[in-house]
A protein has these predicted regions:
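Transmembrane-helix boundary motif in ABC transporter permease subunits
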Residues: 12, 21-24, 38, 42, ...
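C-terminal transmembrane helix and the adjacent membrane-cytosol boundary/short C-terminal tail
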Residues: 10-24, 28, 39, 95-172, ...
Length: 440
């Protein structure tokens, strides 16, 4: 839950940003308390994002093997570990493929029902599509009424608790109810941030310890482990450069394919649009172990195992959907009247795209590239199966060290990666926000 919570938050945020806050204010003017307006108005509107976040977490956790392998025991074996055991130890590719197909079938079945009820467009920050139109609501029937009854009940409970709190706790007359709500929101947000960030920052002090193994609290202060990372015999600098090179090329190819696809999906109406969108974002909803095993089969026939080209193509497959989703979210907020004005002044579509559209949304494009870069840089499953032992990326080297020899060198590498990735994320978020402000 700790590792996957950010993915859930980002998925819900994309939908919640499109909710009109005036609706809750209107409910307040009609006498509804904040609890009632949340459960009866805000939560139903944010349900596509909540469901999308839950499903993405479910699918991603199905493909998890790093955390169970490092922290779990024999009784905590996950299905991905079973697939890897059949391939690496038993060389039973047929049985591993059968398990992978069962896993893929389960995931596709779940997302089929999700698409029927809410629509896959919510994954790109859209609202409920045609899948949740009046026709679907009529099919839901009793289920919708039952759900509304639950939400109404939760709203009444929250309203009653709020009224009881007002009677028991005396408020400062100079402070409004919104001030207290804002304070509570900051407290909850602070707890979540501490939950997410605190375990990560435990790595930093450990990387400066004088001991030869991981201990807490760390003893002494030493830079020897950072010296080990940058020593001439260390594999980490070369692995870092290799990971950066692969991530750059993967991000480039993902942008080359993903940006035109995003424009087509947002601006064009054609038959089978939802099917094509589902196909393009399918790597997001498919556990990476299935993609890695499938690409291993394919690339082995094409003699691409153990080559940089094979690894770059594999990373492009998993990064392209994130580029499409990110660029689609930016294009949806773009004012097409700017393009139309350029057309009326005699500019062609290609010139308009190059001199008008791209400069305005370039922040979003750079952010999409950086997201693709981060995902590729941090990818382990593809590196395990597509490198063929010929070379190793930085995540693969860290994985081997975590399994074979855990020492403070790993903490030093993790600290450097934390600084590197944090810088990229902050820059990409800054560019995304600036792009949204320019579009708005």
């Amino acid at each position: 839950s700790h590792a996957l919570m950010p993915l859930c938050v980002l998925t819900m945020l994309a939908v919640m940003e499109n909710i009109d806050t005036n609706l809750a204010k209107a409910a307040g003017t009609l006498g509804a308390r904040r609890g009632q307006s949340f459960w009866r108005i805000y939560f139903p509107l944010s349900l596509p994002g909540v469901a999308a976040g839950g499903l993405l977490i479910f699918v991603t956790s199905l493909g998890f093997f790093i955390t169970p392998a490092l922290l779990g025991g024999a009784r905590d074996t996950m299905i991905v570990q079973l697939i890897m055991f059949q391939i690496d130890s038993m060389l039973n590719w047929g049985f591993a493929g059968a398990i992978s197909m069962l896993l893929l079938g389960t995931v596709l079945l779940i997302f089929f029902f999700y698409d029927r009820w809410l629509g896959l467009s919510t994954l790109s920050g859209g609202t409920q599509g045609k899948a949740t139109s009046s026709g679907t609501k009529r099919r839901v029937g009793l289920g919708a009424r039952f759900g509304n009854s639950i939400l109404n009940g939760l709203g009444e409970i929250c309203a009653g608790l709020g009224a009881l709190y007002d009677k028991l706790v005396k408020r400062d007359p100079a402070r409004s109810r919104a001030d207290y709500s804002r304070r509570s929101l900051w407290i909850v947000a602070g707890i979540v941030i501490v939950f997410l960030a605190a375990p990560t920052f435990f790595i930093i002090p450990v990387s400066f310890t004088e001991e030869g193994f991981l201990t807490w609290p760390p003893k002494g202060f030493s830079l020897q482990w950072y010296g080990t990372v940058f020593a001439d015999s260390s594999p980490y600098p070369a692995a870092f450069l290799r990971s950066v090179l692969v991530a750059l090329f993967a991000g480039f190819f993902a942008m080359l394919i993903g940006v035109p696809a995003a424009f087509m999906l947002v601006r064009k109406q054609f038959f089978g649009k939802s099917v094509i969108f589902a196909f393009l974002v399918s790597p997001i909803i498919t556990p990476h172990i299935i993609l890695a095993v499938s690409l291993f089969y394919l690339f082995a026939r094409l003699h691409l195992i153990g080559t940089y080209l094979g690894l770059i193509l594999g990373h492009t497959v998993i990064t392209m959907p994130y580029v499409i989703v990110t660029v689609m979210a930016v294009i949806k907020n773009y004012d097409v009247r700017l393009d139309q004005a350029a057309w009326t002044l005699g500019a062609g579509k290609l010139k308009t795209l190059w001199f008008i559209t791209f400069p305005i949304i370039k922040g979003g494009l750079i952010a999409a590239f950086m997201f693709a870069f981060i995902i590729s840089f941090d990818e382990l499953t593809m590196a395990i199966y597509l490198t063929g032992g010929e070379f190793a990326t930085l995540p693969k080297h860290m994985w081997v060290d975590a399994i074979m020899r855990v020492n403070p060198t790993l903490a030093a590498v993790a600290t450097l990666m934390l600084l590197f990735m944090t810088t990229i994320i902050l820059v990409s978020e800054f560019l995304r926000r600036r792009s949204v402000r320019r579009i708005g």
